[in-house]
C-alpha cells in the first residue's frame, strides 16, 4: 500500500498493521509510521519523520538544500535504514554505502577525499559532501538523535 500526501496537506499518520509506503509533498510534513516496516519519504520541505516500530526505511530522493532537511525522530540502529538516491547524492555507487564513504565525528566535516556521508555525533546532523575534504561545500539533509551507533551499513544507495 502506498499513500502520497496531496498538495497543501501537512500530516500523514500510517495506520493498520501492514507495511505502508508514505510519501510527503513539497511543504514541511509530519509523517508517522505504524508498527510495520514502512518506507517513509518526506519529499520536499523540512519534514519530521517517525517510523514507529518495525524495520523502517527513510528515503532521500529530492534536491538537497536548507529548505529540505528532514528530522528522523526515532532512527533505530541497526533496524532502520536511510536510502539515498544516487541521482541526488552524486558520486555514490548503488548498493550499501562503502565504509570509506562514511565518517562519524563531532565536527561534521569530511576528513579525507573519500568521505561523502558525515554523521555529526554531538548534534545528530547528517551531511552530504560530494567531494570529501575538497572545495565543494557540504549540505545537510537530515537530523537524527545524537550519539547513535550508526555506521555505513545503515545507508543504502539506489
What annotation goes with each model-predicted range?
Residues 13, 55-158:
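Acidic glycine/aspartate-rich repeat arrays in secreted/surface proteins
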Residues 1-71, 81-82, 125, 136, ...:
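Glycine- and aspartate-rich repeat motifs characteristic of hemolysin/RTX-like Ca2+-binding segments
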